[in-house]
Amino acid sequence: MNIKSTWVVFLTLLFFIPFAPSLAADSSGTSMPPMQAIAAAIKKVAFSPSSSTPAKNDLKEHIAEQQEAIVFTAPPRETPEQGMEIYKPVAEFLSKTIGERVVYKHPGTWGVYRTEMLKGGYDIVFDGPHFNSYRMEKLSHNILVKMPERFEFAVIVLKEQKISTVAQMAGRTFCAHAPPNLGTLVLLSQFDNPSRQPVIISTNGWDNIYAGVASGKCLGGVVPVANLKKYDRAGNMKVVLKTQAMPNQAFSAGPRLSAEDQTKIAQALLSPDAAGPTAKLRAAYKVGDSFALANNQEYRGLAEFLRNEWGYY
């Protein structure tokens, strides 16, 4: 019975009958056998069975169907339409890889992204190293493949500025992406006293951050070293701080996927067959020709950059 028909029946009963009985829905749980570790690159993870409620109408059936699917997501850096264009081919490729339905789900907002992540609502995720590290430590995810180029950030000011240390920039303006962007969190981690932190002027795009510093809109900025080399060919900037290299964005998989399926996903994303399905993703994030194999150990400790972000700790 659809929603419109249900509403008509309800109004009819309300008119003729003074009281209507309430309906109760039963719920049942399913259990899965424990996983077996089948590959040295994939650590053994715990499986938490999900419970489902028998569908009573089309809406509940649709919700149940979505819950049963393996959910693939990425941060809301793109619009829902852009996200679908970039990530849906990857989801379809992974569906064929493991023989289960994988759906791409755009989170909508950063708040929803955080909330759903902490609830364990995402099974496969592509995002930054600090998020991968957090899911590994807190949500039993394994990190499968990564962008091969390592991440290094530079805190920059115009060359003529009489500034030589980050400490001198306390309370000053910085062009940077809004947190929880990793570059911004790396910058903020340099200031122990929150009252002495720089003022972040939210700026989208590394090129716009560089331009903001060059134009004098902001005293400083934080950009990847690779981007700085491209933008600052004239040598107008001074690097006040350069971070240690760290692993780049990566795919992680959670405990609803067996160790066998996680291995299949990693192998598939590294294979030549992934070239087509991942083409738009690789182009959007300048991955190069292919991803590289990742491991949990190299991401350990990077979750600390989320320590002062609300909701994570």
Task: Annotate each predicted stretch with a short phrase.
Residues 95, 99, 118, 192, ...:
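Sec-exported extracytoplasmic/periplasmic mature domains
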Residues 104-115, 199-211, 246-247:
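Short helix-initiation/N-cap motifs at beta->coil->alpha
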Residues 2-3, 11, 19-112, 118-120, ...:
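N-terminal hydrophobic or amphipathic helices and topogenic motifs
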Residues 71-77, 149-157, 233-273, 283-309:
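Periplasmic-binding protein-like
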Residues 126-138, 212-237:
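A ligand-binding cleft/hinge motif common to bilobed small-molecule-binding domains
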Residues 67, 73-95, 130, 152-211, ...:
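Bilobed "Venus flytrap"/periplasmic-binding protein-like clamshell domains
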Residues 86, 90, 109, 113, ...:
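Stable alpha-helical elements in mature extracytoplasmic
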Residues 107, 111-168:
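Acidic, polar ligand-binding/catalytic clefts
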